[in-house]
């Protein structure tokens, strides 16, 4: 699964959450430990695809924020502050890792914002799947590790037989 495919998967989820008219505020939230070149590419792929998919009268304001997670509870504090200051809440919140997803889930419940913010989580744990079942989180995106393993083996076999491997695995 590459950044293009991940971006398309996120776009598919976000497209159904856009306001019919007016501007939809979308925030991509990650931590310094999960922020990579790959997450940047996913963000730009979503931005590009949403621009082409939006309908007349729809506007999208896409932003990203990376929480410095070098100290304990930095992520929790940032998410809490965001929910306490309700004016800064986006319409759609896209979580780019499991820690952010679980913090946002807890804040939605703690600050009575369930239904006010649509949330796309990342990964699948019992907590996240339970939140989706309850309708607190809209959806989650997770990588299929079996598929990643198969692609890795294919890339390794190609490298061993040809001396190089393509970048599409």
Could you tell me what each predicted segment is?
Residues 12-19, 47, 51-55, 80-88, ...:
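Sec-exported extracytoplasmic/periplasmic mature domains
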Residues 27-30, 121-123:
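Short beta-strand/turn micro-motifs composed of small residues
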Residues 144-169:
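Hinge/cleft segment of the Venus flytrap/periplasmic-binding protein
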